[in-house]
A protein has these predicted regions:
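Aromatic-anchored, glycine/proline-accented short structural segments
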Residues: 43-57
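Conserved phosphate-coupling serine/threonine residues in phosphotransfer and NTP-handling enzymes
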Residues: 118
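An amphipathic alpha-helical interaction segment
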Residues: 1-37, 55-61
């Protein structure tokens, strides 16, 4: 009976350690996402995010891959494009700059690459767009 209790104690202790490690990872990802939400309209990079969190850039990539199956760079791009899509529906003219793209051409290129349509077509016919 003592052996069984000792073994259970060890198992639960190990589980507790693993849960704390997972929570720490999740906190880094949550803070990274908060940073993205607050700064997406600026010219930020994955290095900026990692430095803000005080962690290694490679580690940040790994955390995002585990959590979202994509890089933080891809997450940032998707967030910018979805924000732009919402602004297109509202008719905002300075969408590219407001969403952190350096110029309208880069924005249009990325938008078309991801959504297979131009921002102008999306603005004209938002009801026809395929939503992710």
């Amino acid at each position: 009976e003592y052996m069984l209790l000792s073994r259970l104690y060890n198992i639960f202790g190990h589980m507790k350690i693993q849960m704390k490690k997972q929570q720490a990872k999740s906190i880094h990802v949550e803070r990274a996402i908060d940073y993205i939400y607050e700064n997406y309209s600026k010219n930020i990079s994955v290095t900026d995010i990692a430095e803000y969190l005080g962690i290694d850039r490679t580690y940040l990539y790994r955390l995002f891959k585990e959590e979202y199956n994509m890089s933080p760079q891809k997450y940032l791009l998707n967030f910018r494009l979805k924000t732009a899509m919402n602004k297109l529906e509202g008719g905002n003219m300075s969408i590219a700059y407001n969403c952190g793209f350096n110029d309208a051409s880069a924005f249009c290129h990325q938008f078309k690459k991801v959504y297979k349509d131009t921002p102008l077509n999306y603005r004209r016919y938002p009801q026809l767009a395929i939503r992710e």
